[in-house]
């Protein structure tokens, strides 16, 4: 699966339910039909606590046995145990985690075939160094990982074509965008709520294949204008 023109403009993980991306959410194991796509929402239910726990435990046990599953959305709160179970799905190519109580990303490193990854709000995470194992990653989206300051690992993901870094209302503070400068294959980049200390977009000057850049209004206008002059084919929104 290569990125489409629409992916490059609006992002790979954009919602397109008319195409079953994601499919309808599933709460109970018996609702899953063995398809290649699964939208799992097994937490934040109205079940009593003991039944809720049993439900999550059942999914944790079952997920590693789903040999046909290729794309998994986890659209309710994700525990560390549930995340680790998802990372054991053998043929997984795409994983979307909306948000959760995850404090360790390292289990994802065992999924060397992973190509598309979104990690939503997970404020306990302090390091993304484990992503260095995912050399085949094509799309990476990280959201509200405010305790992560070192983005250097991103520069080693040379196959990345799509990158999104979201900070939300609380700005995500990082030193600079230097790691992004090494992503020669990058085609879209979303930087919303991210605040490099030097406020510079210069690391993007050499990204010849970059076609879409999404920024929030807080970026210095002189930086944005200079980038547009140097990269006239770049669409900045």
Outline where the language-model segments fall.
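Concave beta-strand-loop units of leucine-rich repeat
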Residues: 2-237
């Amino acid at each position: 699966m290569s990125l489409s023109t629409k992916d490059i403009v609006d992002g790979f993980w954009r919602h397109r339910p008319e195409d079953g991306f994601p499919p309808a959410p599933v709460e109970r194991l018996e609702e899953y039909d063995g398809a290649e796509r699964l939208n799992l929402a097994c937490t934040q239910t109205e079940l009593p606590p003991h039944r809720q726990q049993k439900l999550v435990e059942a999914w944790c046990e079952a997920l590693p046995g789903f040999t046909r599953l290729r794309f998994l959305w986890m659209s309710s709160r994700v525990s560390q145990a549930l995340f680790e179970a998802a990372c054991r799905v053998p043929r997984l190519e795409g994983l979307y985690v909306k948000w959760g109580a995850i404090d360790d990303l390292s289990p994802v490193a065992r999924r060397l075939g992973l190509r598309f990854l979104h990690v939503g709000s997970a404020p306990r995470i302090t390091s993304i160094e484990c992503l260095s194992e995912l050399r085949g990653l094509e799309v990476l989206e990280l959201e509200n990982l405010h305790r992560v300051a070192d983005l250097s690992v991103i520069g080693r993901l040379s196959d990345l074509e799509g990158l999104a870094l979201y900070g939300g209302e609380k700005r995500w503070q990082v030193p600079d965008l230097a790691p992004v400068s090494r992503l020669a294959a990058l085609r879209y980049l979303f930087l919303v709520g991210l605040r490099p200390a030097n406020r510079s977009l210069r690391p993007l000057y050499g990204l010849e294949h970059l076609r879409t850049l999404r920024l929030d209004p807080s970026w210095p206008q002189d930086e944005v204008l200079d980038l547009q002059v140097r990269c006239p084919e770049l669409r900045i929104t």
